[in-house]
């Protein structure tokens, strides 16, 4: 800013790290000359009194001429705080210079837009002018009325001034005023006396409270120093409670672990059961396809088998059909996991039990597969009408294959 204003020297904040009154006085004189070149301010700052007088003169000049209030203490310190005070003056000069430059650059634009104006601002100015005109009219009317009454008022005023004062009435009024003043003084004295008495009472109460506080403090210290009789029992109960809590935590963790193991076991059993069902379904589909293929191949051959043998084979197939579904259902019911769980809290034999159960399930699944294959072959064999007689060789071949 100082460079923009035309100050010849370069100024930085490093110059004000330590008090530098010479630089501050030089800058102040230059700024004052910028405001008013004909001003006469003494520049002597050798002694302390001269510096104080210089700072006061600068502050008074800026307050009267530029309406800028400066802090004389901060200026006298001549450090970083003085820079803030100097900025108050330089900012005003810098803003004035900027506005002047902007006005010079906008002269051509003002000539071009001379007849252009802001309609909104003009309307606001018009409203303000109308309000002021109405106020001026009202004030003028009231002033005219008062001036019309001035003749009568002048006569009354002169009569009141010329009338002699009665001493008795004046003394009476003065005595009444003196009595009122004396009553107020007495009231004030009473209040002061009451304040003194109240102060004494408050001091007495404060002393009493202090004594009670000291007494209670000593009592508290004695109570803290004495060990209660029930403290030993309390500590024992607390230790026992802590032990019970530890046992509870251990059992709770074991229970949570066992519940998780049970859920895992149920999930594994469900997965095995679903896998067995899927394998059975696949085998059934495969058997159906094989039976269809065998039926198609057997239908092309001639029937040379005796009717009696056909009847015997039909009866045997009926017996096998009735016996096999019952055994398959028993195997499936044995293969399903029981919902009742019997055991101890120890988990040492869980792996062996799971292995044995897995082996039993595998054996039962194999038996179920064989029974289902036989059932499918038996159920599909008598599907054709009795008019055609089939040879036994395809059935034997299908049983031997599976």
Swiss-Prot record:
Record Pfam families: Cluap1
Recorded family membership: Belongs to the CLUAP1 family.
Keyword set, alphabetical order: Cell projection, Cilium, Cilium biogenesis/degradation, Coiled coil, Nucleus, Phosphoprotein
Function: Required for cilia biogenesis. Appears to function within the multiple intraflagellar transport complex B (IFT-B). Key regulator of hedgehog signaling.
Compartments where located: Cell projection, Cilium; Nucleus
Coiled coil segments of this chain: 187-297
Top-rank taxon, per record: Eukaryota
InterPro entries for the chain: Clusterin-associated_protein-1 (IPR019366)
Region (Disordered): 292-402
Lineage summary: Eukaryota, Metazoa, Chordata, Craniata, Vertebrata
Name the record gives this protein: Clusterin-associated protein 1
PANTHER family named among the record's database cross-references: CLUSTERIN ASSOCIATED PROTEIN 1 (PTHR21547), CLUSTERIN-ASSOCIATED PROTEIN 1 (PTHR21547:SF0)
Subunit description: Interacts with CLU/clusterin. Interacts with UBXN10; the interaction is direct.
Any one Gene Ontology BP term: neural tube closure
Keyword Coiled coil part of the UniProt annotation: yes
Bias (Acidic residues): 301-317, 349-377
Phosphoserine carried by residues: 303, 313, 315, 398
GO cellular component: centrosome; ciliary base; ciliary tip; cilium; intraciliary transport particle A; intraciliary transport particle B; microtubule organizing center; nucleus
């Amino acid at each position: 800013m100082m460079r923009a204003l035309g100050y010849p020297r370069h100024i930085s904040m490093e110059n004000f790290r330590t008090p530098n009154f010479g630089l501050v006085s030089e800058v102040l004189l230059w700024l004052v000359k910028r405001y008013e070149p004909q001003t006469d301010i003494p520049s002597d700052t050798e002694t302390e009194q001269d510096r104080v007088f210089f700072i006061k003169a600068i502050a008074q000049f800026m307050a009267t001429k530029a309406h800028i209030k400066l802090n004389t203490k901060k200026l006298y310190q001549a450090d970083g705080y003085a820079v803030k005070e100097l900025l108050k003056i330089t900012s005003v000069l810098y803003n004035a210079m900027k506005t002047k430059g902007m006005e010079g650059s906008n002269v051509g634009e003002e000539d071009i837009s001379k007849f252009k104006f802001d309609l909104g601002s003009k309307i606001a100015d018009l409203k303000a002018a109308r309000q002021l005109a109405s106020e001026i009219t009202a004030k003028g009317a009231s002033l005219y009325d008062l001036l019309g009454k001035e003749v009568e008022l002048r006569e009354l005023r002169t009569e009141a001034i010329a009338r002699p004062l009665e001493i008795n009435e004046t003394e009476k009024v003065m005595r009444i005023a003196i009595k009122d003043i004396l009553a107020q003084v007495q009231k004030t004295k009473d209040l002061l006396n009451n304040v003194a008495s109240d102060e004494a009472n408050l001091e007495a109460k404060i002393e009493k409270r202090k004594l009670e506080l000291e007494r209670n403090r000593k009592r508290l210290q004695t109570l803290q120093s004495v060990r209660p009789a029930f403290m030993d029992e309390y500590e024992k109960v607390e230790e026992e409670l802590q032990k019970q809590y530890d046992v509870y935590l251990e059992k709770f963790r074991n229970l949570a672990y066992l519940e998780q193991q049970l859920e895992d076991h149920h999930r594994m059993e469900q997965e095995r059961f679903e896998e067995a069902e899927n394998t059975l379904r696949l085998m059934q589909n495969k058997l159906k396809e094989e039976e269809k293929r065998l039926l198609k191949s057997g239908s092309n051959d001639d029937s040379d088998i005796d009717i009696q043998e056909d009847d015997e084979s039909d009866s045997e197939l009926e017996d096998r059909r009735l016996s096999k579904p019952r055994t398959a259902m028993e195997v499936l019911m044995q293969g399903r996991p029981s919902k009742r769980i019997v055991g101890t809290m120890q988990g040492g034999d869980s792996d062996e039990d799971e292995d044995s159960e897995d082996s039993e399930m595998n054996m039962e699944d194999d038996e179920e597969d064989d029974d289902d294959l036989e059932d499918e072959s038996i159920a599909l064999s008598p599907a054709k009408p009795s008019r055609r007689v089939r040879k036994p060789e395809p059935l034997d071949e299908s049983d031997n294959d599976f």
